[in-house]
Amino acid sequence: RCPFFYFSDMVLAETTCDGKKKMYELMSELKHCHIMQLPPGKTGRGALEFWKQEVISVKEDLEDFYHIRITDEQIRKAIHLRNRERKAVLDFFEIGRLKPTPITGYEINTVISSNEFTVDLEEKIKYLEHRTAELKELYEKEYKGKPSRPRVLITGCPTTGVIDKIVRQIEELGADVVGFENCCGPREKKDPIDETKDPITAIAEKYLRVNCSVMSPNPGRLEALDAQIDEYQVDGVVEVLLQACHTFAIESDAIRTFVTKEKGLPYIAINTDYSSGDQAQINTRLGAFIEMLG
């Protein structure tokens, strides 16, 4: 059970995945739900203004529900704090750029996901900054100049629910997962909210820029993948496709073509779910893939 849902007064949701949209209808029977309606694309006429009104609607619902008033100055302070958090998370993710990496992809994924349960953002920032500094020191003392194992980048769907069957398995088979170009990776963290603009407008602009597969078209994902492959010195790409996420599945053909043709790297797509029934098959395919990486 999710502790957030149990202890929450209301749920803030958005219309990304179709399954989630229907789930929120059921959740609304238990909690007050505010559902933000996403525009179908980033660049369509009126997309930004539409999304800005959705952000305003959230603010108004929070004020009505909690009987409070949210000022622009309070929003600016929250933006500044969240930008600091983004920087701390991004710096931690980018430890994977070191070669050889002093941290496993399993730890990266676990630390980031577990810290989402930290309510005190100052505490979260402090922990991540401290752990990042520790890992940089460890790299200088014990890893720098040593041979590196094959370096794998994960792309596609969120990996939190399949971390053991995919991320851990890759590393047990002899490769290092050094980066994540997916929903739980540094994608959103690289782009802070503009602190010089009207706060509502800045929030709307920032979240409309996220390279999510539900947006059509979504060229920013290829640009981000291109940069991350180079920055992390990647040897191969593993795309995780959860069975219910059709938008990522559709994009996978373009991703495969880009990785193999444009970047000249090995690529494999793993179609899976949260069950363990396909573990043996995944192990076999990942084992063969990692052998290709040398």
Residue spans for each PLM region:
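A charged, amphipathic alpha-helical module
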Residues: 56, 60-189
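Trp/Phe/Arg-rich N-terminal binding region typifying the photolyase-homology
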Residues: 1-72, 178-179, 183-184, 188-294
